[in-house]
Amino acid sequence: MQKVSLFLSICLICLSFTACQDDLDDVIRPADQLQLNNFVWQGMNIFYVDKSEVPDLADDRFQNEDELFAFLAEFPSPEALFDHLLTPTDRFSIIVSDFRVLEDALNGIRVDNGMRFGLVRITNTNLVFGYVRYVLPNSPAANAGVERGMIFNKVNGVLFTPETDFGALLSGDNYSISLAEFNDGNLVDTDIVIALDKITLTEQAIHVNQIIENEFQKVGYLMYTGFRRNQENELNAAFGNFVAQGIDELVLDLRYNGGGDLRTAVDLSSMITGQFEGSLFATQEYNANFDDEIINFTTQNRAGEGLNSLNLSRVYILTSPSTASASEMVISGLLPYVDVVQIGTNTVGKYQGSITVYDSEDFRRQNATLAHSYALQPLILSLINADGFTDFDDGIIPDIELQENFSNLGILGDVNEPLLRAALEDIGFALDRPAPKLYQPVFGELLMDDNQNQLDYQRMYVEFKK
């Protein structure tokens, strides 16, 4: 197939549906199973980044339409076909039966109680517990008194074990958590039970935004939890304040940031710097259907508005095993140009991006069929930085390794929070307060976090260009 630009004209196939879905409130009419499966195969055949590794996606796999439809008829559902067309190592491509739910997730909207947490197995034991990472303001969890650092080991009275089905246990519209605490490194039950309800919430990507200063230095601290295209103005405003206040250093906290919109990651990297306009940020490598494309550092957002840039030559980035995709691309994209001091633990290792593929003639959202609301979110590209760095399957290794101590998480933004303190000490920032007292350390293996069952979990997505 002749290569074409992905974002020019994708008139590669016209599916059999002709009705349009310009209005989200339009009634969805039942689709024929074969037509649904055809949409899945066509979308994956055109876009899937690993198409060459899937024999059933080869352009010459079927001699005619009858052969293709006979193959499609073997699969009882679009989900079954989609799974069949993925490579064994693909953890991130998904299919959804209602693209409106996916769109909400990508914009930070979901039914939630506002408690962000991780589930951990203590090293060399069968003890499992949850720990609260942070709480969304004005959420049910915040109103119930849940705070960062709280430990819980039961949900609805069910004690956690390595075999617990956490997805099922935590999926209800409401549940209760039973608090526990560490005493000399031992996990001890308390009598405190907190009931939590879920409502529709929109998470603000900027969780903490502050300036830490003394007589000689100003350090900006930004805890950023997701790259959301609908919150670009808030991010630019935060950097506008950093510029106005004249900060000398920046600590960017991405430890709980699983990724999101790639263009927002480029903009954030451009705000941190500013002196590399037009320089290569990354190359987008597609399958053989499309030419590779480049992404450059910029001085404007997608609306054409100027970015507030710091022109820094060094940035500190805090990471954890939950740091993924667009977060990793900020690190990777900046590495060839500035001193990136990474503090924490290895990141996830996600360097591929996806788009939402709708059932329309050009696979865009406009004019999507009324026959169903399915959409695909397949991996369509790999990203390579200006130095050729990619394929970091084991994550990006920190310069200063420091695992979160679950018995002493600290307060986000406080100078004695362990990861932030490590950054300030490396900067040479004079700290008035002494280091906090030592706690019996508690470390463990992260089993899952609260976002793991969400549609936007650790995904990096791009848009069709206009």
Regions found by a protein language model. Give the residues of each.
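Flexible, low-complexity junctional segments that flank or bridge functional domains
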Residues: 21-249, 441-466
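C-terminal "post-core" interaction segments
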Residues: 221-222, 230-237, 242, 249, ...
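Active-site beta-strand/loop signature of hydrolases that rely on acidic residues for catalysis
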Residues: 255
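C-terminal motif of bacterial Sec signal peptides marking the signal peptidase cleavage site
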Residues: 15-19
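Bacterial N-terminal signal peptides that target proteins for export
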Residues: 1-7
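Hydrophobic helical h-region of N-terminal Sec-dependent signal peptides
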Residues: 9-13
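A general structural signal for short secondary-structure junctions and capping/turn motifs
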Residues: 3, 105-108, 167-169, 212-213, ...
